Amino acid sequence: MALENLLHPTNIKIDEYAKNATKFSFEALERGVGYTLGFALKQTMLYSIAGACVTSIKINDGKVTSLEDVIPCDETVADIILNVKSLSVTLAEDVETGTITFELSGSEEEIFSEEAKLSEGLAITEEVFICSYNGGKKLKIEAKVEKGVGFRPAQDNFKDCEFLLDATFSPVVFCDFEIKDARVGRRTDLDKLELNIKTNGNVNCEEALRLAATKIQNQLRNIVDIEEINKGIFVEDPKDINPILLKHVEELNLTARSSNCLKAVNIRLIGELVQKTENELLKAPNFGKKSLTEIKDKLSELGLSLGTLIENWPQDL
């Protein structure tokens, strides 16, 4: 079958069946394409979309060191850790880390997330119950918030006076897909792809799907043009390339924010970076004008610029 005759989904339905939960259906697709797309989108949404979350918690300035310690509230230490960990948070574009603080004293009361003191650039997007404070003794809860991509397991349970947490950065909290039979005319050997997506509210489901599709598209862009692949891309010896282009982007000494943005889109070498346009970089998650300006300035110091075509760039580095 000619590539141009492959079916593309023409019947697309969007069903927002609950808050921050949407089911998407796409039909009709060639047999097998539904599974291929569904699996790729699911994995990308769960593990490759950037976000922010609580990564560690300190109680009473680190004096509480065990889940068995007694604190002045109805909940256990473990309960409070789980409640604080469940907070949906966002960090401003130019902020990499933040702090959430609860300082409790006086009479007993129920404490919710809206009573927290937040560092600059940090926001809590949904109200969450934290604890039932019993009054009397003071109670201080500090939570560290970081940006990241995918999942990062805690290397220890408790370190440096803090309870360390497994970090799930993706704003997509659930994604699954199902393949059903579809029909077009007399053809009954087709796929219908149904995607079920739930987010924490920091990104809506449609935006999460778009981000995932864009990431997959960027990964595949070098093999989209079949004619170029058939011709074969033969490159010159790397020694003929400016050695600066073969250095890792870490040698530019960028800020953590800019470095993380480049890692998120798999830009490892300076040569890969200079071949990107400004618009391409601005489409990367959490990549803003400050990062763009910083990168342009660093490249300029080396006599380089964005949007540079490198004809003999090795594709297998």
From Swiss-Prot:
<feature type="region of interest" description="Alpha N-terminal domain (alpha-NTD)">
    <location>
        <begin position="1"/>
        <end position="227"/>
    </location>
</feature>
<keyword id="KW-0240">DNA-directed RNA polymerase</keyword>
<dbReference type="GO" id="GO:0003677">
    <property type="term" value="F:DNA binding"/>
</dbReference>
<dbReference type="GO" id="GO:0046983">
    <property type="term" value="F:protein dimerization activity"/>
</dbReference>
<feature type="region of interest" description="Alpha C-terminal domain (alpha-CTD)">
    <location>
        <begin position="241"/>
        <end position="317"/>
    </location>
</feature>
<dbReference type="InterPro" id="IPR036643">
    <property type="entry name" value="RNApol_insert_sf"/>
</dbReference>
<dbReference type="GO" id="GO:0003899">
    <property type="term" value="F:DNA-directed RNA polymerase activity"/>
</dbReference>
<comment type="similarity">
    <text>Belongs to the RNA polymerase alpha chain family.</text>
</comment>
<protein>
    <recommendedName>
        <fullName>DNA-directed RNA polymerase subunit alpha 2</fullName>
        <ecNumber>2.7.7.6</ecNumber>
    </recommendedName>
</protein>
<keyword id="KW-0804">Transcription</keyword>
<dbReference type="GO" id="GO:0005737">
    <property type="term" value="C:cytoplasm"/>
</dbReference>
<dbReference type="InterPro" id="IPR011773">
    <property type="entry name" value="DNA-dir_RpoA"/>
</dbReference>
<dbReference type="InterPro" id="IPR036603">
    <property type="entry name" value="RBP11-like"/>
</dbReference>
<comment type="subunit">
    <text>Homodimer. The RNAP catalytic core consists of 2 alpha, 1 beta, 1 beta' and 1 omega subunit. When a sigma factor is associated with the core the holoenzyme is formed, which can initiate transcription.</text>
</comment>
<keyword id="KW-0548">Nucleotidyltransferase</keyword>
<dbReference type="GO" id="GO:0000428">
    <property type="term" value="C:DNA-directed RNA polymerase complex"/>
</dbReference>
<comment type="function">
    <text>DNA-dependent RNA polymerase catalyzes the transcription of DNA into RNA using the four ribonucleoside triphosphates as substrates.</text>
</comment>
<dbReference type="Pfam" id="PF03118">
    <property type="entry name" value="RNA_pol_A_CTD"/>
</dbReference>
<dbReference type="Pfam" id="PF01000">
    <property type="entry name" value="RNA_pol_A_bac"/>
</dbReference>
<dbReference type="InterPro" id="IPR011262">
    <property type="entry name" value="DNA-dir_RNA_pol_insert"/>
</dbReference>
<dbReference type="InterPro" id="IPR011260">
    <property type="entry name" value="RNAP_asu_C"/>
</dbReference>
<dbReference type="Pfam" id="PF01193">
    <property type="entry name" value="RNA_pol_L"/>
</dbReference>
<keyword id="KW-0808">Transferase</keyword>
<dbReference type="InterPro" id="IPR011263">
    <property type="entry name" value="DNA-dir_RNA_pol_RpoA/D/Rpb3"/>
</dbReference>
<dbReference type="GO" id="GO:0006351">
    <property type="term" value="P:DNA-templated transcription"/>
</dbReference>
